[in-house]
């Protein structure tokens, strides 16, 4: 559910008046939820009834995409702006739900199997994202650019997902977070997070933590901006006579293949 509409959202933006402007806005909209990732993760850790929120928020996302389906029938910028807001809200909810899942996984998987379980979860996430985007492009093609139908399909996926979780809700157990008497300031929480990450690096005997962190940030910055440039470039220069959505799927396919291939090697270079 969280991936079917990713490419379709860019294609919807390209159908607006002044498509390059709309696609540029869409590129920025996709990035906004990443600014809240740390805060959302902290809130997920503090949530006491994780299974309940995991299920209920899935139903909320289904409702959001029903609204998106209604809005995409209009080509106005007011409708586009509302879809952008709903997309941001849904992506933040998806990040929050991912944070809720981790403690449940930790509780129900033996410690010796946790790393293997994390790796398998990551693999399924990448494959699910790729399959979801491919499904979105296929639905868009057979429906002749019917954005509402794709959004409704997305809503159906969230509905089925939460309904499945509801059926096994008794098994979604986790350790209850310790209640804190005094709420820590956000700045203090960020400082503690930084110190914890630094401690992990030191345990792994990785020297010069700040330099490694800077390298990661510098590598991620251009890598994260490449897709936005492709979105604009492919408006006028699609690959091999394909349309925009199919060309974007080719790029995503190469990215997923690269990530999975890199994950197969555990050596550092």
Per-region residue spans from a language model:
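Helix-to-coil boundary motifs at intracellular loop junctions of multi-pass secondary transporters
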Residues: 12-16, 46-47, 104-108, 142, ...
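Juxtamembrane intracellular "pre-TM" segments in multi-pass secondary transporters
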Residues: 171-213
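Transmembrane alpha-helix termini and helix-breaking/packing motifs in multi-pass membrane transporters
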Residues: 10-16, 69-74, 129-153, 236-237
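A single, central transmembrane helix in multi-pass transporters
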Residues: 7-8, 147-149, 198-263
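Small-residue hotspots at the loop-to-helix junctions and early N-terminal turns
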Residues: 17-27, 119, 242-252
């Amino acid at each position: 559910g969280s991936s079917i509409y990713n490419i379709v959202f860019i294609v919807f933006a390209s159908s607006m008046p002044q498509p390059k402007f709309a696609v540029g806005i869409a590129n920025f909209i996709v990035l906004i939820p990443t600014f809240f990732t740390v805060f959302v993760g902290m809130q997920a850790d503090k949530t006491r009834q994780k299974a309940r929120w995991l299920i209920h928020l899935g139903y909320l996302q289904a409702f959001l995409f029903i609204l998106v389906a209604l809005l995409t029938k209009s080509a106005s910028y007011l409708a586009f702006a509302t879809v952008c807001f709903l997309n941001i809200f849904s992506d933040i909810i998806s990040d929050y739900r991912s944070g809720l899942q981790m403690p449940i996984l930790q509780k129900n998987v033996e410690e010796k199997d946790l790393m293997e379980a994390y790796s398998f979860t990551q693999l399924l996430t990448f494959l699910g994202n790729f399959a979801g985007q491919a499904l979105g492009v296929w639905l868009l093609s057979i429906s002749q650019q019917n954005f509402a139908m794709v959004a409704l399909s997305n809503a159906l996926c969230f509905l089925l997902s939460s309904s499945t979780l509801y059926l096994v809700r008794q098994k979604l157990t986790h350790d209850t977070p310790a209640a804190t008497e005094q709420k820590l300031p956000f700045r203090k929480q960020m400082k503690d997070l930084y110190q914890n990450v630094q401690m992990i690096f030191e345990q792994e005997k990785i020297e010069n933590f700040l330099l490694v962190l800077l390298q990661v940030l510098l590598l991620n910055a251009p890598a994260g901006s490449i897709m936005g440039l492709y979105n604009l470039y492919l408006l006028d220069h699609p690959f091999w006579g394909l349309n925009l959505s199919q060309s974007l799927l080719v790029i995503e396919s190469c990215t997923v293949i690269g990530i999975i291939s890199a994950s197969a090697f555990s050596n550092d270079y």
